[in-house]
Every structure is written in C-alpha cells, then in structure tokens.
C-alpha cells in the first residue's frame, strides 16, 4: 500500500434498512439505497426483457410486484451471504462505479457481531472482490468519532436494531453493550397499526413505505407524553395533514408522538424490554464506576431512528431522573446523525495514522480470515 497515496479508500456501512456507501474523505455517502435483494417470482415471465436473476436496492423496490424481496441483514447482522455479496457487488460496480481490487475497503459491523461473521466478511472482500486491503469497524465507535470524541456512550438506533455502546478511549466495552430489538421498522409497524385503528388501510409493502415517509416527516417525541396527550384532546395544535400519493389527504394528531413514544415505552407494542433511556442507563451501570461520569457527560445519539424532533431533550430528562442527582448529563444529537456511522468511517479511513491499521491482502493470504480478530477490535 506504500504507493497508494492517491487511492481513495471506500467506506461501506451496511444497515438493516439502508446501505450507505462512498469514498473516504467525503463528507457524506454518495450512494444510499435499501438493503434489499429481489429475485423474480416466476422465471421467464418478462420475455425479451433481458431479465436479471436478481435486482438490488431501488430497482428491487420499484419492481417488487414481480419479485420476492429478501433483506440479507436482520437486526443489524448479516444472515444471507449470497444476497450480501449481491449487495456489495451492486455497491461497487453500479453505485460507486469502482473496481474493488483497486481500493482499500472499510466495512462496518454491528456491536457483538459473531466472530464467524467478521471472518466471512473478510473472506468475501479478499477472495471474491480481491480488495488490496480492508478493515472492519464497529458502527457505534465510528459515530462517536464523527462527533469528535473518543470516550462516550452511543445510542445507535437504525431500522432493525438499537444498541447502547459505551466506548472508552476509542474502544467499545463489550461487557457493557446492550442490544434492543426495537427500531425504525417497529415504529413504522406501530404507526400502520394506529392508522388502521383509525380506519385507514395500510397493509402492503408499498403502503408501508408511505407510512414510513409519514413517520419520518411528521413524528416527534413529546417531552411529557401524558401532558401532550391531554393537550391533543382539546387542541388542534398538534394536527398536521399529509397527502397520500393518490391525492387523498389525511390528518394526524396524537399519532405523531404516539408512534415514537414506543422507544421510551416498549410495553406499548407488547415488548417487555426497557426503553432506550433505561437501556442507556443500564449500559452505563455495567461500566467501571470511575468512567461513568465521562459516559453521562457524552451520550451521543446516532442512526435514523434518533432523527425525531425532541429526542435529545426527552433523553436528557429521562436519564437525569435515573442518574445520581449531582451528575452532569449531556446528550449530543448531531444534525448529521442519520449518517454519522458512515461519516466516522470516512474520517477514520482518511487518517494518516490509520494507514498502518488496514489488513493487507498479503497478511490475509498468510493468516486467513482469523486475521480480522487480531487487527480489528
């Protein structure tokens, strides 16, 4: 890699819902598309269409009528490697239009990703895509870097899973990481259910996308849920209208904050788990007493499901109620947090000090996939 001064590393953040990919040193990902692979339900139906055996991302989304859709990543963890390979292939060749054998690749992984998975990612990069070098970084750690910190606790909540990850001087503390299987997809489902109770019918995958759009545009988190609920009964101040693709306009009021309230009260959808505030607190309590102060003072939100208005203030209020009374609590919600994992990767892969951290192809050839545990931690 000594001569590779002019070669930009690629950064690929594979989420349950969306793939974020681009070039190290950029301030935002070039390509953002759904993590979906679609295969034709009936082969040879579309005569003369030059039908592909698989479609990825937006194309799969738009042709979903004739396809069977699969999500190769569930709850942040890859569970279907053939489809994952298709997604990476699409990322390199169709979205970024690069030859992966010419660029180092930084991939991201969920916290507590199984060891076998890291090895499989490493193997595919070197053997299928022939990358000259690669690295695997934990998503939450990258978000923390993107916020300009090396110590703090990250609440990373995406489409398929949420994690609370305490990080001290750049290293995640695995014994204190907690996973919550409650994230964006569950909120969309909950909003679909609330709207169905009101007499609107949203059931198909296409309609789910409409509800997701509604959730993203109109939902917010109440500072005081009960009080907001009372206000919404007597006043129309929380009402907003939303135009559906067919031109029909629906008005939603209390649904706007009832939907994401589930993050703080999972019991609303029948889950027994503690909410995101309590999970964050529990994570901090699993850490050494000497570093808790640094964690309470650096609570960083990351991921698309933390994009709701009001989330920072509410989180601050809830954690203040749980923490020791003298503790200084700071919740940081960076405006670009939807992409902060990717941005952190872009920063890391461009650092001159990081250049000796890459796993080189020669090292892989010598040691095999297990090299990833020695070089990426």
From Swiss-Prot:
It is found in: Cytoplasm, Cytoskeleton. It is an enzyme of class 3 (hydrolase). Keywords: Acetylation, ATP-binding, Cytoplasm, Cytoskeleton, Hydrolase, Nucleotide-binding. The keyword Hydrolase applies. It catalyses: ATP + H2O = ADP + phosphate + H(+). Its EC number is 3.6.4.-. One of its GO terms (molecular function) is hydrolase activity. The keyword Hydrolase applies. Belongs to the actin family. Polymerization of globular actin (G-actin) leads to a structural filament (F-actin) in the form of a two-stranded helix. The binding of profilin to monomeric G-actin cause the sequestration of actin into profilactin complexes, and prevents the polymerization. This is Actin-4. It comes from Arabidopsis thaliana (Mouse-ear cress). The gene is ACT4.
């Amino acid at each position: 890699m000594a001569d590779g001064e002019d070669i930009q590393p690629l950064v690929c953040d594979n989420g349950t819902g969306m793939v974020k990919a681009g070039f190290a040193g950029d301030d935002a990902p070039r390509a953002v598309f759904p993590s979906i692979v679609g295969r034709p339900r009936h082969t040879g139906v579309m005569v003369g269409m030059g039908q592909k055996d698989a479609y990825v991302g937006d194309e799969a989304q738009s042709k979903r009528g004739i396809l069977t859709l699969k999500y190769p990543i569930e709850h942040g963890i890859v569970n279907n490697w053939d489809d994952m390979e298709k997604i990476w292939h699409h990322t390199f060749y169709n979205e970024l239009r690069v030859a992966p054998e010419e660029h180092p690749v930084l991939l991201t992984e969920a916290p507590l990703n199984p060891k076998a998975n890291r090895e499989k990612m490493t193997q595919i990069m070197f053997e299928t895509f022939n990358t000259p070098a690669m690295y695997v970084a934990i998503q939450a750690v990258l978000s923390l870097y993107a916020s300009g910190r090396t110590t703090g606790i990250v609440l990373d909540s995406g489409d398929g899973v949420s994690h609370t990850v305490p990080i001290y001087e750049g290293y995640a503390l695995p014994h204190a990481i907690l996973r919550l299987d409650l994230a964006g997809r569950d909120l969309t489902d909950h909003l679909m259910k609330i709207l169905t109770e009101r007499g609107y019918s949203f059931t198909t995958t296409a309609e789910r996308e409409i509800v997701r759009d509604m959730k993203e545009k109109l939902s917010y988190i109440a500072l005081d849920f009960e009080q907001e609920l009372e206000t919404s009964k007597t006043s129309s101040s929380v009402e907003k209208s939303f135009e559906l693709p067919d031109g029909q306009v629906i008005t939603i009021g209390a649904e706007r904050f009832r939907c994401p309230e589930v993050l703080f009260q999972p019991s609303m959808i029948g889950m027994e788990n503690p909410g995101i505030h309590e999970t964050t607190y529990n994570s901090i309590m699993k850490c050494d007493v000497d570093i808790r102060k640094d964690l309470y003072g650096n609570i960083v939100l990351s991921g698309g499901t933390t994009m709701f208005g009001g989330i920072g203030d509410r989180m601050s209020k809830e954690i203040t109620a749980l923490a020791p009374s003298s503790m200084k609590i700071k919740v940081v919600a960076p405006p670009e947090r939807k992409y902060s994992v990717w941005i952190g990767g872009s920063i890391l892969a461009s650092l001159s000090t990081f250049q000796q951290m890459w796993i080189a192809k020669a090292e892989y050839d010598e040691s095999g996939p297990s090299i990833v545990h020695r070089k990426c931690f």
